[in-house]
């Protein structure tokens, strides 16, 4: 994550001179990230699928709710890290030849590095607020990549369309998150640091059965999260 973010900034000086180096630097970095992802997956498997996490850092305190930033590695996360870095590596290797001669060659690899960093951050997020922030960053990168050749009307139109569609889905996801945040005491005793979907799936029906919330609220939260998943397709098209 850190290396991809750094590369997105470091290759900026190559925009005008030595643009070819941008592709090689980016590919070298993502190759190292892919190897580390494989090592992470092997470590998780050797530990019997034990979840690995780091003590989260408090980022923002809102009333009784603490918004933290952390890293969470479990078997699913380890697998997704391998997939994200592996696919990104193949795309970037192909792009070295495909983008050869393009005047915005270095800018493309800068966007790809930021996109990869955003996806990695999304995968390893330890709480839903962090997840949402990285998801929005993924949306920004998707918009930049889809509209990369912004001077072409078709690319500009496609980027705007993808941006609008994903914003609609994200709005539903945001509403669901806000409801969970302001009712954290009901669902998890104020603890929003779990990304385990089974926790939410169990907490919502139990809260409804206990009469703490209405069943209609559970339905609307589910619709909000579902709309978010539905809006993801245009973003993956850019990868």
Predicted stretch roles:
Residues 1-239:
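...captures the hydrophobic TM-helix bundle architecture rather than a specific catalytic motif
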């Amino acid at each position: 994550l850190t290396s991809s973010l750094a590369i997105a900034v470091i290759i900026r000086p190559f925009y005008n001179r030595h643009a070819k180096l941008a592709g090689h630097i980016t590919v070298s970095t993502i190759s190292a990230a892919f190897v580390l992802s494989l090592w992470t997956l092997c470590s998780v498997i050797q530990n019997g699928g034990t979840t690995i996490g780091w003590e989260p850092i408090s980022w923002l305190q809102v009333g009784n709710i603490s918004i933290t930033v952390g890293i969470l590695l479990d078997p699913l996360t380890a697998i997704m890290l391998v997939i994200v870095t592996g696919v990104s590596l193949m795309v970037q290797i192909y792009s070295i030849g495909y983008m050869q001669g393009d005047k915005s060659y270095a800018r493309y690899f800068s966007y790809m590095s930021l996109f990869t960093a955003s996806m990695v951050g999304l995968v390893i997020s330890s709480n839903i607020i962090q997840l949402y922030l990285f998801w929005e960053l993924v949306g920004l990168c998707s918009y930049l990549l889809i509209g990369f050749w912004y001077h072409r009307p078709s690319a500009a139109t496609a980027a705007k369309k993808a941006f609008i569609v994903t914003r609609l889905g994200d709005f539903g996801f945001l509403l669901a998150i806000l409801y969970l945040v302001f009712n954290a005491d009901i669902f998890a005793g104020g603890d929003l640091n779990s990304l385990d979907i089974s926790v939410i799936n169990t907490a919502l029906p139990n809260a409804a059965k206990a009469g703490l919330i209405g069943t209609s609220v559970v339905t609307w939260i589910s619709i909000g999260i579902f709309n978010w998943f539905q809006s993801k397709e245009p973003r993956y098209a850019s990868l």
